[in-house]
Design a protein with these regions (language model features):
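Phosphate/ATP-binding catalytic cores across multiple sugar-kinase/actin-like superfamilies
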Residues: 42-53, 92, 225-242
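Post-His helix in hydrolase/transferase enzymes
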Residues: 181, 288-289
Length: 289
């Protein structure tokens, strides 16, 4: 799959995606124009390895955070690996350009709810952009906006009894500062045929499964670039759906490579929900994903 990815996309400077994934350097891999196709490829390669080593692995439902929503849609058969890789490579380039043009940042807010996050934004914006961008888990919200507003947000959070930390990111993702990227992504999505999903896939914007209308799905993917990711709502709704569908005992939760960040967030959302991570696929599980 990595060899196929190298044939589909070419990174800035002619770097091969496979070499960047396995050998770095980290500084290059951390650029969103490189990290997005890398994450997409790693996730689908991980699933393919699980199937190869352990046999058929039916996907009962899929969700992914930010870029991961494209991985989830590919697993559900909405588009092919190659189509998805081209889309996320375009998304990464557009967001990288918007980030460099807007000089923004992001701040992790610990301990507050949505109302407190809005209060911090109101106090720190001072005419600039500063908005909640990621609702990751209860008590864990990320703000996004102009760099100066992010600096002020750290101070404002402290006065409200909250902890805040600036994140080492390339830009103000999931905020209005990404509007140029959203416009470009809308044009890119027009040229890709979306097929009916084989399973429910949750929208980062609504926190609910996508409907059957391809145009609405594409519009939500565009909105996702400039609107907050409601990951906690996605997970809560997915768990409720799994229980209502009678899948609690048969459909296990799997986090595809790389990393285990989502497993950590799920502990905050529902400690009873067990997530299996697959940074390396040495013991594939023949359970529904």
């Amino acid at each position: 799959m990595f060899a196929h990815a190298d044939q589909v996309v070419e990174l800035d400077g002619g770097a091969r995606l496979s070499a960047l994934c396995f050998d770095g350097p980290v500084e290059s891999l951390n650029r969103t124009d490189a990290s997005q196709p890398a994450l997409f490829t790693c996730g689908l390669a991980c699933h393919a390895a699980m199937v190869e080593q352990g046999g058929e692995l039916p996907v009962a439902g899929a969700l992914g955070l930010s870029l991961g929503e494209y991985t989830a849609l590919a697993l559900a058969g909405v588009f092919t690996f190659e189509e998805g890789l081209r889309l996320v490579a375009t998304r990464g380039r557009l967001m990288q350009r918007a980030a460099e043009a807007s000089k923004g940042g992001m701040v992790a807010l610990i301990g507050g709810d949505e109302a407190k996050a809005n209060e911090v934004c109101a106090a720190a914006a001072q005419g600039q952009v500063l908005v909640p961008a990621n609702f990751n888990a209860p008590g864990q919200i990320v703000l996004s906006g102009h760099a100066e507003a992010c600096d002020r947000a750290v101070t404002a959070a402290g006065t409200l009894g909250l902890r805040a930390t600036k994140l080492a990111v390339a830009g103000a993702f999931h905020s209005p500062l990404m509007a140029p990227a959203a416009e470009g992504m809308a044009r890119a999505l027009e040229h890709v045929e979306f097929r009916p999903a084989r399973c429910p896939v949750w929208s980062n914007v609504t926190g609910k499964p996508h409907g059957k209308d391809p145009a609405t799905l594409k519009a939500l993917l565009v909105d996702q670039i400039v609107k907050p990711v409601r990951w906690d709502t996605c997970c809560q709704d997915m768990l409720a759906w799994r229980k209502a569908s009678g899948l609690d005992g048969s459909a296990s939760l799997h986090e595809l490579a790389p990393g285990s960040v989502l497993k950590g967030l799920m502990r905050r959302i529902d400690r009873a929900a067990e997530v299996t991570t697959h940074d390396t696929v040495e013991e594939p599980q023949r359970a529904k994903a």
